């Protein structure tokens, strides 16, 4: 089956991406190796030159007609590949004449100049213009959201020019590599897609701005974790099998690499023993109490392992691994090229200290291995602090599991296998540790008695601290042990008399022990909460470190936004030079404008229609980026407009002005603000906010006037905007252009005008939307019907007006407010009757119709 054009473009784009990744890697290689192995590079360079000459002009022409994400990316990639290939070729030629590695790298990496900054000029009118500086992908995305907000007041020519500049800046920022450079994006700055994702999940009582703070964006630069964390030494050894026989010392380096990570730690090896013991029990076997405790402790130990990830690598192992890989590479290079490799990584290591090397990483180690090492070192530094030594629960958990295993293995003297009192005590201790409450009720009076006597033998210290006087009922006067003998005898007697009372209370509850148990439980709870917060903080920082160190690809968001905006501007400008579009301003004058206005100015819209009309106002005020109203499960237009305003950073009071404008009013005198032939003419505006409000009022007048026109004349005109495509089923089309802001599709023709009411008069001058002449029976032909057959509807200007043989709405005595008269087909003369009152005053009728 033959591929279509889109599939062929995808194949070309895939091959270009493959070559782009290879070319990007060549920039960091040793130039001596490149000169020795330059044949594949020259062959690929010739292919790129051919593709650039053959495909690039066609892709550019396609994007100036109708763009897509694929064609925009291919245009950007082909030009970048052509430039970088020529640059690398020139750098290699210069290096061959004068070997200087530093100069070579400065040339191919463009370190001597910075072209990653651009200033965009936006001009709305002669008096309103702005300059915006852009430097990162986040700046471009935010600027595109602002362009979407002002889409209706920006000329299509200016919009296309700005989009071309943004595409050029994207090419300079991204280059040929799909991997985004760290200096071209800000990971802590959110985008429009982050905003939309947060709007569809529960907010838990937090505002959207607070939820956006601290969020890592994964759309501008998409995080792609490396799939292979450990280097397969066996695969490397198999690839170097031929060289191993010719280079004697390679075998020793490979064996050292294999043995470096092969030794597994025996730390907490009894966890496997516990799991082996648990395999002997299932649903239909008798399960002892200690097995329940062992199962619970094993579960919590696994949960702890998920929270605190142990990494089986140290920084010393990573350094040794890096040195061994470097020795392996240099050994192969000396055998093939006669010298060690001195690429940009070797030159850069000399300028970095230890911590900087760790964050930069190693060319031989996967990024996630570095991330795991940093996380492990962070947790270890936290646990080594003496203040937090006891907060780490994992060692305590493993110790409990070990003790239970020892009790299971150790036979008791009664031969019960640990089911005696000692085993029960272990079970109780395990349940107490699992519950964490520490609340204990005394069930034996001996323990309470011994506790009470121990308190009394301490010289009455417990009573002196607040409880003694209440116990003896006033018999204790608070004296110390150095009082008189009589006083001592009285006190001993009182204590003996109150002994039964204190003992009875102690049987009920032991206050001292309860306080100690609750104190320990509280400290344990504080430790758990504090440790959990620290671990969550470390995990958050781990995600940030992963975003910084791991691979991040350039996301498609910016190109997608540019494509949508370009298509919108292209649709707005495609009918500018069309000769088939008829300008109604050449046919009608101010009289026709006044005719329609006077027929609408005294009417009013139904109040119940305002909410639906407000949604249409939001639709026409919005740009092409946020169009969730067309989704499978569509959102309302006010939600799309809210997305556009929030992502553009519109101030709250400006949003309130937009809402008040969209709410509308039922009286035409309050919304008819546009002058004759002045629709979408904002040349008098001196400020962007005023310009935006004027645009909203023009859109409101369009929507409400067309709705009132349909209500008054019984029509069904619909409105669309040139935002994505020209709707063939819509009648009135808003183009947002100053020269011809409105189009009317009617009876197979396309009309344009700068005045809304002239277009409505053009539509009104036909009997109905389909263009069929009414077929009501006529008694006998007259001059009017003959003229109507020739001219379509109206008489010639020099002919006198003759009354219609059919009764009009005024002659029938029917009020203009009665809607039933508007639904029946009208003759030509009934249009004139709408402009006359019952007294026959004809001042509102245009002169050409009298």
UniProtKB/Swiss-Prot annotation:
* Binding of ATP, residues: 709-716
Tell me which InterPro entries the record gives: UL28/UL56
Its main subcellular localisation, reduced to a broad class, is host cell
Q: Where is this region: Disordered?
A: 438-489, 801-831
Q: Kindly give the Pfam families that the UniProt entry links to this protein.
A: PRTP
Q: How does it assemble?
A: Associates with TRM2 and TRM3 to form the tripartite terminase complex. Interacts with portal protein.
Function summary = Component of the molecular motor that translocates viral genomic DNA in empty capsid during DNA packaging. Forms a tripartite terminase complex together with TRM2 and TRM3 in the host cytoplasm. Once the complex reaches the host nucleus, it interacts with the capsid portal vertex. This portal forms a ring in which genomic DNA is translocated into the capsid. TRM1 carries an endonuclease activity that plays an important role for the cleavage of concatemeric viral DNA into unit length genomes.
Query: By what name is this protein known?
Result: Tripartite terminase subunit 1
The organism's lineage is: Viruses, Duplodnaviria, Heunggongvirae, Peploviricota, Herviviricetes
Q: Which gene encodes it?
A: TRM1
């Amino acid at each position: 089956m033959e591929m279509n054009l889109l599939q062929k473009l995808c194949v070309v784009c895939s091959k270009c991406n493959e070559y782009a990744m290879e070319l990007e890697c060549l920039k960091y290689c040793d130039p001596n190796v490149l000169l020795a192995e330059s044949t594949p590079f020259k062959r690929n360079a010739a292919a790129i030159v051919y593709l650039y000459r053959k495909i690039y002009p066609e892709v550019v022409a396609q994007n100036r007609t109708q763009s897509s994400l694929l064609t925009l990316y291919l245009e950007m990639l082909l030009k970048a590949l052509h430039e970088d290939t020529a640059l690398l070729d020139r750098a290699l030629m210069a290096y061959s004449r004068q070997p200087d590695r530093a100069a070579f790298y400065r040339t191919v990496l463009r370190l001597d100049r910075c072209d990653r900054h651009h200033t965009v000029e936006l001009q709305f009118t002669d008096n309103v213009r702005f300059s915006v500086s852009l430097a990162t992908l986040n700046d471009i995305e935010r600027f595109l959201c602002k362009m979407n907000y002002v889409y209706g007041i920006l000329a299509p020519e200016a919009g296309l020019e700005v989009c071309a500049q943004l595409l050029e800046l994207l090419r300079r920022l991204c280059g040929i590599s799909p991997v985004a450079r760290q200096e071209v994006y800000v990971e802590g700055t959110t985008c429009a897609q982050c905003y939309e994702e947060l709007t569809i999940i529960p907010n838990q009582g937090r505002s959207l701005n607070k939820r956006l703070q601290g969020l890592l964006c994964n759309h501008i630069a998409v995080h792609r974790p490396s799939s292979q964390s450990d280097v397969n030494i066996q695969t490397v050894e198999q690839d170097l099998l031929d060289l191993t026989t010719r280079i004697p010392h390679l075998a020793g380096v490979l064996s050292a690499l294999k043995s470096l990570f092969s030794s597994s730690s025996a730390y907490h090896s009894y966890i496997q023993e516990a799991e082996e013991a648990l395999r002997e029990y299932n649903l239909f076997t008798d399960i002892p109490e200690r097995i329940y405790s062992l199962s619970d402790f094993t579960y919590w130990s696994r949960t702890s392992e998920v929270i605190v990830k142990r990494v089986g690598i140290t920084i010393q192992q990573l350094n040794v691994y890096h040195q061994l890989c470097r020795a392996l590479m240099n050994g192969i290079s000396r055998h093939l090229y006669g010298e060690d490799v001195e690429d940009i990584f070797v030159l850069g290591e000399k300028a970095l200290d230890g911590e900087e090397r760790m964050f930069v990483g190693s060319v031989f180690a996967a990024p996630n291995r570095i991330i795991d090492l940093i996380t492990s070192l962070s947790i270890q530094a936290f646990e080594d602090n003496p203040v937090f030594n006891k907060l780490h629960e994992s060692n305590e958990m493993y110790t409990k599991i070990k003790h239970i295993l020892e009790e299971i293995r150790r036979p008791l003297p009664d031969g019960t296998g640990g089911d005696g009192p000692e085993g029960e005590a272990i079970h109780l201790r395990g349940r107490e540790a699992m519950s964490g409450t520490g609340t204990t009720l005394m069930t034996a009076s001996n323990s309470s008695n011994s506790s009470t006597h121990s308190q009394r033998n301490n010289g009455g210290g417990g009573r002196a601290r607040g409880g003694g006087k209440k116990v003896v009922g006033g018999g204790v006067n608070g004296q110390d042990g150095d009082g008189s003998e009589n006083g001592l005898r009285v006190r001993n007697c009182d204590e003996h008399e109150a002994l039964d009372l204190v003992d009875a209370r102690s049987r009920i509850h032991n206050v001292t022990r309860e306080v100690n148990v609750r104190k320990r439980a509280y400290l344990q709870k504080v430790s758990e909460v504090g440790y959990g917060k620290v671990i969550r903080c470390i995990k958050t920082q781990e995600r940030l470190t992963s975003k910084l160190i791991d691979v991040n690809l350039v996301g498609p968001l910016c190109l997608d936004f540019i494509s949508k905006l370009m298509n919108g501007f292209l649709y707005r400008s495609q009918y500018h030079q069309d000769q088939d579009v008829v300008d109604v301003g050449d046919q009608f004058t101010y009289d026709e404008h006044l005719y329609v206005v006077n027929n609408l100015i005294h009417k009013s819209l139904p109040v119940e229609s305002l909410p639906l009309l407000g949604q249409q106002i939001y639709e026409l005020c919005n740009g092409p980026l946020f169009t969730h109203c067309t989704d499978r499960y569509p959102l309302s237009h006010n939600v799309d407009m809210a997305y556009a305003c929030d992502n553009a950073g519109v101030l709250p009071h400006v949003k309130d002005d937009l809402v008040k404008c969209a709410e509308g009013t039922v009286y035409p005198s309050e919304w008819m603000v546009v002058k004759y032939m002045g629709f979408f003419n904002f040349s008098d505006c001196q400020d962007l906010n005023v310009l935006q409000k004027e645009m909203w009022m023009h859109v409101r007048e369009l929507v409400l006037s067309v709705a009132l026109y349909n209500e008054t004349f019984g029509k069904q005109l619909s409105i669309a905007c040139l935002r994505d495509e020209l709707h063939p089923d819509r009648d009135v089309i808003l183009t947002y252009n100053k020269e011809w802001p409105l189009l009317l599709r009617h009876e197979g023709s396309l009309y344009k005008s700068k005045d809304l009411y002239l277009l409505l008069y053009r539509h009104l001058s036909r009997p109905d939307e389909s263009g069929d002449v009414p077929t009501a029976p006529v008694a006998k032909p007259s001059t009017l019907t003959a003229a109507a057959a020739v001219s379509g509807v109206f008489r010639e200007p020099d002919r006198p007006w003759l009354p219609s043989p059919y009764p009009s709405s005024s002659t029938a005595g029917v009020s203009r407010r009665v809607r039933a008269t508007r639904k029946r087909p009208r003759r030509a003369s009934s249009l004139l009757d709408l402009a006359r009152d019952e007294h026959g005053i004809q001042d509102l009728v245009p002169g050409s119709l009298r």
